[in-house]
Amino acid sequence: VSSTQRRVEHGITIDADVETVFDLVADVARWPQFHLSAVHAETVHANEKGELVKYWALDGDAAVRTWQTVRRTDRPGRRITFAHMEARPPATELRGEWVFTELAPDRTRVELSHQVGAPADADLGPLPDGLAQDSEDCLTTLRDTAERHADLDELVVSFTDPLFIAGSVEDAYDYLYRADLWPERIPHVVGLAMTEDEPNVQFFDMDTKGPDGSTHTVRSVRICLPSRLIVYKQISLPAMLDAHTGHWRFTETPEGVVAEARHTSTIKRSALSQLGGATTVGEARRYLRRLLSGNSMSNLRLAKAYAEERAGF
């Protein structure tokens, strides 16, 4: 069967230095904080030929799609190439590249291209338009993030809190995996409606009670990698945040388990008045750290008590 190639190309000019822009694309672990649809990405393995990266992304507001690509990063050549391990039918091949050109010390041109291979008689349907829309969204987000990078250094709050658990990793993981039981297990969670239509992909709407007694509802998506990692991203956000992602990570040790809670939040500068008229970014950072750390450490201590009781301690 004869085949044909179709190329989809998009570009954007960004008022930021080429290294900043390149780094934002190269570091896939940071994508979920800035790209609306990105939920999680991790390197499966890497060698001198490149790295195999697995991605999870929102498909609407109630589903997640996942795919794997082989990426090769050429920093001196300012180029990142990628090839999908499996193309979405009827495509038989999907590959592409990012090319970064320095126009001036603080101005960069970025070109993102995709090449789609398919049988000559195949109807690609919405695939090219979907790639075009995804590319435009991705480039726009890249521009906005790169041009705000100095501001975001101040507005992004990121921290990790660990806790040792003298129990099994399976029990510690299970306690936090079973979010449907949180209203009866975790004091600040007053309601939670969860769906898990695909194993280990959870969507839930959670009602939490704040220190002042007020109730907030957020919608989140979670990717659960059994006994190892639970990654989450808030889809609907509190008024003072532009983004909130994080994870629960579980690491076995000879003595038990180290469980860690990670939060990365982007403060919305225009909403600082939510905390009081003259609130500074520094005060908002301290408030967020205290609130988020308090909640997640409380959850970890409950997971610890559950796992250690089941271990006979």
Where are these regions (language model features)?
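Hydrophobic ligand-binding cavity/cleft-lining segments
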Residues: V1-K49, E136-E198, F313
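Glycine-rich portal/gate segments that line the openings of hydrophobic small-molecule binding cavities
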Residues: A29-Q33, E42-R95, D137, D180-E184, ...
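A general structural signal for short secondary-structure boundary/capping elements
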Residues: Y55-G60, Q115-A120, D144-A150, E154-L163, ...
